[in-house]
Amino acid sequence: MADDYWNHNVAFHRRIVRDAARRGGSALDVGCGDGLLLARLTAVCRRAVGLETDGQAVARARRRLERTPQAEVLLDDVMDLDLPQRIGTFETVTCVATLHHLPLEPALARLSELVAPSGRLIVVGLAANKSLWDWMLSALAVLPLRVVGALHRETRDIGVVTRPPRESLAEIRAAASRILPEARIRRRFYYRYTLMWDRPMKVL
């Protein structure tokens, strides 16, 4: 596979990197896969760490980043109890097409623990179609997305572990309202949603 490619997740990389650049500092990419987003974050962050549980993906990400000293790829599970003590907190925490692989509410709580004061959590996620409205919106997007995919020469299979989402967007909103009540969630193009949450500045 080419080092650079496009798909429905990569479509969000530019805005994620632009957002991270406003804070600089350090970035954590949870479920970093082959390291493409992590590599792009190194252009705007002094330190970039990727977490991935798939050993083959970790090997690919490390090859991609072998000449990037400020990047580190860890074969690790974000839900491990001692992870926050081991890796610390980050100005930007990203989680692209990964949250639906994890237990939703515990994962939201854990991701928030990894965000530094004044930092931001950025989730790009997939939601299950459960309501009539969900199905209608997905159906309306089919043709436009095929056109966009053809224009970008979409790469559908990048050789990483995938699974279908379990929770609907309504269920994700409800969970976020309990765990991260200030989170901003929006349905997006590309069968995705975004969740953004800012940790307040620490008051002395």
Report each predicted region and the residues it spans.
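Short conserved loop adjoining the S-adenosyl-L-methionine
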Residues: 80-87
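Class I SAM-dependent methyltransferase SAM/SAH-binding core
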Residues: 34-36, 40-80
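Conserved alpha-helix/loop element of class I SAM-dependent methyltransferases that forms part
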Residues: 7-25
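A short, conserved alpha-helix within the catalytic core of class I
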Residues: 102-111
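Conserved class I S-adenosyl-L-methionine
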Residues: 25-33
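C-terminal alpha-helical "lid/dimerization" subdomain adjacent to the S-adenosyl-L-methionine
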Residues: 127-175
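Conserved beta-strand signature within the Rossmann-like core of class I S-adenosyl-L-methionine
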Residues: 118-125
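A conserved beta-strand element that flanks and buttresses the S-adenosyl-L-methionine
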Residues: 94
